[in-house]
């Protein structure tokens, strides 16, 4: 008989930096999951990413308190800011622009995010990432 799923927990944890402190500890502790086991497995799986990069993770908790987890690609906003070398986007994106990004760089980000996005094709995903860039106060140029 298959294990029954008790809960899904969605978190954003820095790559290689999962530890029992909030937000990881309380979220997993409520469901009775072994926190240190998750932290060790997550840190091992995210070694290939740049340390400190936020990694979305979906943890599936089963009724016997075991778990599995799936890591996603970093958020598009983080990848865009990293590409232009900024710490944060604009507080007023329509009036205050904070940087420019090439369309080719946006397409690279869309290709990186393709596994997690539900776009019909790479062009649609690129347009979606361009919209994210504009909402952050970045100008997309050819």
UniProtKB/Swiss-Prot annotation:
GO molecular function: large ribosomal subunit rRNA binding; structural constituent of ribosome
Similarity comment: family membership: Belongs to the universal ribosomal protein uL11 family.
Organism of derivation: Shewanella frigidimarina (strain NCIMB 400)
NCBIfam families from the UniProt entry: L11_bact
GO cellular component: cytosolic large ribosomal subunit
Protein name: Large ribosomal subunit protein uL11
Modification after translation, per record: One or more lysine residues are methylated.
Underlying gene: rplK
Assembly information from the UniProt record: Part of the ribosomal stalk of the 50S ribosomal subunit. Interacts with L10 and the large rRNA to form the base of the stalk. L10 forms an elongated spine to which L12 dimers bind in a sequential fashion forming a multimeric L10(L12)X complex.
The protein's role, per its UniProt record: Forms part of the ribosomal stalk which helps the ribosome interact with GTP-bound translation factors.
């Amino acid at each position: 008989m298959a294990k029954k799923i008790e809960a899904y927990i969605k978190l954003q944890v820095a790559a290689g930096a999962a530890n029992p402190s909030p937000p990881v500890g309380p979220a997993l502790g409520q469901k009775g999951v072994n926190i240190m086991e998750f932290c060790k497995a997550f840190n091992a799986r995210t070694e290939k990413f740049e340390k400190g990069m936020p990694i979305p993770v979906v943890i599936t908790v089963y009724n016997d308190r075991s778990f599995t987890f799936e890591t996603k690609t970093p958020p598009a906003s983080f990848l865009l800011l990293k590409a232009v070398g900024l710490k944060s986007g604009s507080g007023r994106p329509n009036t205050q622009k904070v940087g420019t990004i090439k369309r080719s760089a946006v397409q690279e980000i869309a290709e990186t995010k393709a596994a997690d996005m539900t776009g019909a094709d790479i062009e649609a995903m690129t347009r979606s990432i361009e919209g994210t860039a504009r909402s952050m106060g970045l100008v997309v140029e050819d």
